[in-house]
Design a protein with these regions (language model features):
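Loop-to-transmembrane helix entry/capping segments in MFS-fold secondary transporters
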Residues: 1, 122-123, 211-221
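Intracellular loop-helix junctions on the cytosolic face of multi-pass helical membrane proteins
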Residues: 1-97, 101-105, 259-288
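Short amphipathic helix-loop junctions that connect adjacent transmembrane helices
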Residues: 108-124
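Transmembrane alpha-helical segments of major facilitator superfamily
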Residues: 127-136, 190, 225
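Helix-to-loop junctions at the C-terminal end of transmembrane segments
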Residues: 138-154, 240
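C-terminal ends and interior cores of transmembrane alpha-helices
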Residues: 162-177
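Hydrophobic core of transmembrane alpha-helices in multi-pass small-molecule transporters
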Residues: 180-197
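Intracellular juxtamembrane helix-capping segments at the cytosolic ends
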Residues: 196-210
Length: 288
């Protein structure tokens, strides 16, 4: 919520400045990047100062080099997940690669799509994303409702199916003739879906993390969320360079969500996923 709220405030600021001073798209982009640079520098400094000092949880084995030990540890963790957590965690991390790639690219490609296909100005694109960010709030409430009626696995898959459907709708229906109101409605629906997608994803992960591996798997979580983030934009770029309509490119990148849904569908039923994690926790507690 803090992340989406900060993005919304920044968008409102830039829309106000652009409209107030009558800037064109180039000037708006220049000013926004300048503000970004200042804000990021301040946030980095503040975060660095406030970051607590924590003792190392592992020591470097004799004869091992720090440069390579991290890779060795990651490989060992990956093998442990494959061996001990086949029912849920393995499928979650695999699905995460494609799910995050889809969600991240959706917002990136939307800028190109709105400009090239819809003919939106920079201010209109800002309004589009402001609407999307506002709608993440009811999306989060909807996520809580759906997840309470089902489970995180089912809820997360449903959010990705809806996201894919929105991609297909936008790619096939939206154009200059449909007008901006329909595009804004589409943006609102995308915002609701992303507001449903992200908290459900994090809830899913938090409920299946094995005891004692929280810090290490948090790194795995970030790694999996970024490892193929480059692929959907590349697919979109290849299609556009081949003179394929941008709408079909939007549909293509949305298809990565279906891969994530298929992977999650291979996981065990939700009670078995939880039992798999709880069983490992109980074993570790007994050994302690």
């Amino acid at each position: 919520m803090v992340q989406f709220g900060s993005q919304l405030l920044f968008l409102v600021l830039m829309i106000g400045l652009s409209m107030g001073f009558g800037w064109d798209d180039v000037r708006t982009a220049q000013v926004s990047q300048a503000i970004n640079a200042v804000q990021i520098s301040f946030s980095f400094y503040l975060g660095w100062r406030l970051l607590p000092k924590t003792p190392a949880s592992h020591s470097l084995p004799d004869g091992k080099h720090l440069l390579f030990q991290g890779f060795a540890q990651n490989w060992a963790t990956a093998k442990n997940i494959q061996r001990d957590y086949k029912k849920g965690l393995r499928w979650f991390l695999l699905a995460l690669c494609f799910a995050e790639a889809t969600a991240n690219t959706f917002t990136l490609v939307a800028v190109v799509f709105l400009d090239g296909v819809m003919g939106f100005s920079g201010t209109q694109i800002g309004i589009f994303f402001a609407i999307s960010l506002v709608c993440t709030i009811p999306g989060g409430l909807f996520a809580r409702f759906v997840t309470s009626k089902t489970n995180p696995n089912t809820s997360w898959r449903l959010s990705m199916i809806v996201l894919f459907g929105l991609g297909v709708f936008g790619g096939l229906v939206l154009n200059r003739d449909t007008g901006s109101p329909l595009a804004y409605v589409w943006g609102a629906m995308v915002g609701i879906t992303l507001g449903w997608f992200y908290p459900t994803e994090r809830l899913f992960f938090s409920m299946i993390v094995p005891h004692g591996l929280e810090a290490e798997l948090s790194g795995f979580y970030v790694y999996c969320s970024q490892i193929i983030a480059w692929l959907p934009p590349l697919v979109f770029s290849i299609l556009v360079e081949a003179n394929v309509a941008q709408g079909y490119g939007v549909i293509a990148i949305s298809g990565f969500a279906i891969i994530a849904v298929a992977l999650l569908s291979m996981a065990a039923p939700w009670p078995e996923i939880l039992a798999d994690t709880e069983e490992e926790k109980s074993t570790e507690s007994a050994e302690a």
